[in-house]
């Protein structure tokens, strides 16, 4: 995963928590951070798959794409090693979380060729990635958040660590991860946990599970009262590492209107078969599997 995870709760929750905890003193800093993070899409506010733009104040279901970008420091160019789609339904107070395997072969919208889905970010940034994911899943992507490689460890460090449920014991990068509930104290430890693939019989699918676990853990951890005292460090990490089309007022409203959905997070999986085409490895997702996942996400978004 290469230091490339961010949760909607961190973006939509931590800034609000910081305002509550630090008051007006930090407000200008928060505004500056939100401004640094803001990177609008070429398409504007409306997905091509919606008749009208998503209205935050209407409290309707919406979707957000989390892209972990294979880049360092303050750059946001590179391939997306992690693609996670969240659909959020405030009426059901639930979130569905889908990891799209990075080797998934699909059409890269805007290039007219089939390739690995994680190449879309390198070819055309957030906009091409969103267009490609929308075409693949046949749902609107209303907002996006991207984080570069160096951001992940900073965010976990700022939160003071996260708890996850480990399905089997393994070691990675000098860390030993026991079976059962474990606490990942540092960003480096969380990174090692999330990146492990070769010791897992499920390969990338197992790694995707661990990525989703950490996203869920960050959502829950960022909502805790203890995060208030860490707001400054979190904001520093966010400002340097994250890009999003959301502005500060949108983050505030989403946090206010949708935070109840974090109580119920369901992890989804899409599966396929690996193959080699021209000696390049791809994951081929059967059409019936794509249709199954599309139907579940559309239902959660109340589109069908």
UniProtKB/Swiss-Prot annotation:
Broad enzyme group: transferase
InterPro entries named among the record's database cross-references: LytR/CpsA/Psr_CW_biosynth, LytR_CpsA_psr, TagU
Subcellular location: Cell membrane
Task performed by this protein: May catalyze the final step in cell wall teichoic acid biosynthesis, the transfer of the anionic cell wall polymers (APs) from their lipid-linked precursor to the cell wall peptidoglycan (PG).
Family, per entry: Belongs to the LytR/CpsA/Psr (LCP) family.
GO biological process: cell wall assembly
Pfam family membership, one: LytR_cpsA_psr
Record-linked PANTHER family: POLYISOPRENYL-TEICHOIC ACID--PEPTIDOGLYCAN TEICHOIC ACID TRANSFERASE TAGU
Full protein name: Polyisoprenyl-teichoic acid--peptidoglycan teichoic acid transferase TagU
EC nos: 2.7.8.-
Residues in the Cytoplasmic compartment per record: 1-3
GO MF terms held by the record: phosphotransferase activity, for other substituted phosphate groups
This protein's GO CC annotations: plasma membrane
Residues that span the membrane, as ranges: 4-24
Region forming the signal peptide: none
Parts forming coiled coils: none
Superkingdom of source: Bacteria
Alphabetic keyword roster: Cell membrane, Cell wall biogenesis/degradation, Membrane, Signal-anchor, Transferase, Transmembrane, Transmembrane helix
Extracellular topological intervals: 25-304
Main location: membrane
Topological relation to the membrane, as annotated: Single-pass type II membrane protein
Pathway(s) the chain acts in: Cell wall biogenesis
């Amino acid at each position: 995963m290469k230091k490339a995870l961010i949760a909607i709760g961190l973006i939509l929750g931590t800034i609000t928590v910081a305002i509550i905890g630090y008051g007006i003193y930090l407000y200008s800093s928060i505004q500056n951070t939100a401004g640094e993070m803001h990177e609008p899409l070429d398409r504007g506010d409306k997905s091509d798959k919606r008749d009208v733009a998503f209205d935050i104040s209407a409290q309707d279901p919406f979707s957000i794409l989390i892209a972990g970008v294979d880049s360092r420091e303050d750059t946001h160019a590179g391939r997306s090693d992690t693609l996670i789609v969240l659909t959020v339904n405030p009426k059901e107070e639930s979130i569905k979380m889908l990891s799209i395997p990075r080797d998934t072969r699909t059409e890269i919208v805007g290039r007219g060729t089939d390739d690995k889905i994680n190449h879309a970010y390198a070819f055309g940034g957030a906009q091409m990635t969103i267009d490609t994911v929308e075409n693949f899943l046949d749902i609107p992507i209303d907002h996006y958040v991207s984080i570069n490689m160096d951001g992940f460890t900073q965010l976990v460090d700022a939160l003071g660590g996260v708890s996850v449920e480990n399905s089997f014991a393994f070691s990675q990068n000098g860390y030993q991860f026991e079976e059962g509930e474990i606490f990942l104290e540092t960003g480096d430890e969380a990174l090692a946990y999330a990146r492990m693939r070769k010791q897992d019989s499920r390969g990338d699918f197992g790694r995707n599970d661990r990525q989703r676990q950490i996203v869920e853990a960050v959502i829950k951890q960022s909502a805790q009262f203890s995060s208030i005292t860490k707001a400054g460090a979190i904001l520093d990490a966010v400002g340097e590492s994250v890009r999003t089309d959301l502005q500060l007022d949108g983050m505030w409203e989403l946090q206010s209107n949708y935070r109840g959905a974090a109580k119920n997070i369901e992890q989804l999986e899409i599966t396929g078969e690996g193959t080699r085409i021209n000696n390049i490895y791809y994951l081929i997702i059967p059409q019936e599997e794509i249709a199954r996942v599309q139907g579940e996400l559309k239902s959660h978004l109340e589109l069908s």
